[in-house]
Structure formats: C-alpha cells, structure tokens
C-alpha cells in the first residue's frame, strides 16, 4: 500500500514539475493532413473529444458579410480530425448553418455550436443528431428566449451551460441542463463585469467562468453566479478572442489579435496563464515559435497538452507540441 501511494505521489509530482517546466512549444508542421481537393473555410471553433479527436467548426465557402446571408452552407461544417495525423475521420453539418461561430465539446462528447446569423445555439450528439436548439431562428432579442449574435458556449460537468451573447448583447446567460433560462449578467461597458463583445468563454471545475472580453482587450473571471473575481488586461492592445483551460486545470490559454493604426493585421499571440490570471508565457507574433500567426479565432488544448489554433485569415489549423525543458 505504501509503495502504491509512493508511485501515485511520484507520478503527480512528475506531472506538476513537467508542466512547470513547459516554457515553449514547437509547430507540428505536417498537421493537419487534409485531402488535396478539400477546401477549409474560416475555422471559427475547435474542441477536443474524450478520445482526443479534434472537432472543428468551419464556414466552408461562406465569408463574413453584412447584412448576413440567408442561405445555409452546403458543405459539411463539422469536421472530426485524428489527433495524431490530422486526417478527417468524420464530417457532417451541411445545410444546417448560415454563419458558424463558437464550438464546445462537453464531457459527454456532445457538440455545441453557435450560429451568429441564425441567433441560435445548437446541441448535437457526436455523430450529428440534433438534441437541443435555443433561440428563435433569424430573430435577435435580449430576453430569455432570444440571442443577438451568440458567440460561444461553455458546459459544466452537471450539464448546465453558459452562452456568451455576444456581438449584439453584452451578456453571459446561464441555462439548466434542460435548456431552461436561469440568469444572466453583464452589459455594454468597460467596468468590471461589463463587456464589449464577450467572444469566448470556458469553465474550471470549481464553476468559475472565464470570459474573453474581446473589444475591451481583457479576460474576466467570475464565479458560477456571475460575481466578479479578477481580470487580466492585455497591455499590447490585442483583442481577446478565446480562452481554454487544460483538462488537468494547471493553466489557462488565451489568444488575441492586433491590427495597427492603418487597420493592417499584425497577428495573434498565444498566452498561458495560471488560473489566477497570472501570465506565465506568450508566443506568436511576439516570436519564439515557428508557426504562422495572423488572426487566431479559437484555441484548444488536448489531453496531452498539445495546443490547436484556428486562423480565419489563413483559413488554417495549427498544432503546437509542448517542449519540456
């Protein structure tokens, strides 16, 4: 018994120390491996399944435009990629969406997505069967039945979930597992607890909510009831697009996007924080890695610590492996 505990403690110590020694990442330059005739549209969302598959939400031939189009995308917009090879294992989602945006894979491998043109949130099982729809199609609003360009979803272990809503409404809304409206918080502004495009969000196991407050260039942390805890302000003036917590809850990842005074893209950075929002390292346009960095829209870390990014200028996916020093 003592030997068993010693092994477990040693393993825990090794994992913690290994994680503490991760200072940089290297690009997996042969990932993904897509068919030559396959055209990846704007990849707007990334998730990871329990089996470590990479799930991607992309726009096919659709490009962002205002006013929003009304026709649904003909291509399959949900891709299931092999974690190691980057090959497509499955694809579905044709004739379902107008303007794909956020994606979340919950702990039961259900796939949640938002469509900003439809003003809706969808829940599917892993093979594409529709399980739940929230919001009224093509109708925006600010009540408990409507969204206004919802951007992302985060699902808790008990099945309740949060929606960042979004481009049109500056709020975060919580729903029960069954999709019943529970409460919301936030309004447009720059004070603590206010938002200017809540663009992405994630949860830790304590129920705290981390929000990428895009146009305010910051990440805000709240408790499960929406009570403000802390924030991190991006001093490089980069818009914060997405956040993601690793499965072991050792760190939080974030991504930003910077344009200069002439509205020319400068690129994105990847940030790594502890869960108290203390910045530990960053890479991307700031250097220290060999990947491309144009406009990252989403970020995800898999069960092995590999980082994945979705770039909507390059229409590309990238994988970064951790380097243990």
What are these regions (language model features)?
Residues 4-5, 219:
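Hydrophobic alpha-helical segments, especially transmembrane helices
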Residues 19-325:
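Eukaryotic scaffold repeat domains enriched in small/polar residues
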Residues 5-14:
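Sec-dependent N-terminal signal peptides
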